[in-house]
């Protein structure tokens, strides 16, 4: 009977965006970092979080526990909207290397003003990294605190599935790796 009406797709196998992580690494604390935080706040409408350096790197002039980057996690419809803007800047082209083995992908852009934010001379221009975490219904069992479950091997997302999803959803082009 299922073949008569055409193959129905299992709704639990449907891929979707779990979260979009945006990151601006300035490499120093101070005024440039607070301006980068303003850029992320303008883009997402959320308060960004500061990241600290793990260890001291004297050649870069970075001290341990010094705030050097700012990041923000966006979910839901807002994540899809921001991702659409970012992919438009990249002209919907990603490399095969941009996709991880766990089915996630990331890319960077050179200038935040390409996303449609008006240029402000007091803020300047910053590049930012996009990282997209894909998931399926049922992935939350691995994240819960009590009675944590494992995601089965057949339910995990492969690199090929993520690339196929990107091509179908955004009509994206995947270039060969470097």
Swiss-Prot record:
For the modification Phosphothreonine, the affected residues are 44, 47
* GO terms for biological process, alphabetical: cytoplasmic translation; negative regulation of proteasomal ubiquitin-dependent protein catabolic process; negative regulation of protein neddylation; negative regulation of ubiquitin protein ligase activity; negative regulation of ubiquitin-dependent protein catabolic process; positive regulation of gene expression; positive regulation of protein binding; positive regulation of signal transduction by p53 class mediator
Q: What does the similarity note say?
A: Belongs to the universal ribosomal protein uL5 family.
Under InterPro entries, the record lists:
Ribosomal_uL5 (IPR002132), Ribosomal_uL5_C (IPR031309), Ribosomal_uL5_CS (IPR020929), Ribosomal_uL5_dom_sf (IPR022803), Ribosomal_uL5_N (IPR031310)
Q: Which organism is it from?
A: Homo sapiens
Covalent link Glycyl lysine isopeptide (Lys-Gly) (interchain with G-Cter in SUMO2), residues: 38, 52, 154
Q: Which GO terms describe its molecular function?
A: 5S rRNA binding; RNA binding; structural constituent of ribosome; ubiquitin ligase inhibitor activity; ubiquitin protein ligase binding
Q: By its UniProt entry, which SUPFAM superfamilies does this protein fall under?
A: RL5-like (SSF55282)
What PROSITE patterns does the entry give? RIBOSOMAL_L5
Gene name, please?
Answer: RPL11
Keyword S-adenosyl-L-methionine, does the record have it?
no
N6-acetyllysine: modified positions: 52, 85
List-wise, which residues carry N-acetylalanine?
Answer: 2
The answer to whether the entry has keyword Metal-binding is no
Q: Provide the coiled-coil residue spans.
A: none
Domain of life of the native organism: Eukaryota
| GO CC term (a single one) | nucleoplasm
Record's keyword terms, sorted: Acetylation, Cytoplasm, Diamond-Blackfan anemia, Disease variant, Isopeptide bond, Nucleus, Phosphoprotein, Ribonucleoprotein, Ribosomal protein, RNA-binding, rRNA-binding, Ubl conjugation
Sum up the protein's function in the record's words: Component of the ribosome, a large ribonucleoprotein complex responsible for the synthesis of proteins in the cell. The small ribosomal subunit (SSU) binds messenger RNAs (mRNAs) and translates the encoded message by selecting cognate aminoacyl-transfer RNA (tRNA) molecules. The large subunit (LSU) contains the ribosomal catalytic site termed the peptidyl transferase center (PTC), which catalyzes the formation of peptide bonds, thereby polymerizing the amino acids delivered by tRNAs into a polypeptide chain.
Q: How does this polypeptide assemble, per the annotation? A: Component of the large ribosomal subunit (LSU). Part of the 5S RNP complex, which is a LSU subcomplex composed of the 5S RNA, RPL5 and RPL11. Component of a hexameric 5S RNP precursor complex, composed of 5S RNA, RRS1, RPF2/BXDC1, RPL5, RPL11 and HEATR3; this complex acts as a precursor for ribosome assembly. Interacts with PML. Interacts with MDM2 (via its RanBP2-type zinc finger domain); negatively regulates MDM2-mediated TP53 ubiquitination and degradation. Interacts with NOP53; retains RPL11 into the nucleolus.
- Name assigned to this protein: Large ribosomal subunit protein uL5
Write down the disease named in this UniProt entry: Diamond-Blackfan anemia 7: A form of Diamond-Blackfan anemia, a congenital non-regenerative hypoplastic anemia that usually presents early in infancy. Diamond-Blackfan anemia is characterized by a moderate to severe macrocytic anemia, erythroblastopenia, and an increased risk of malignancy. 30 to 40% of Diamond-Blackfan anemia patients present with short stature and congenital anomalies, the most frequent being craniofacial (Pierre-Robin syndrome and cleft palate), thumb and urogenital anomalies.
Entry's localization field: Nucleus, Nucleolus; Cytoplasm
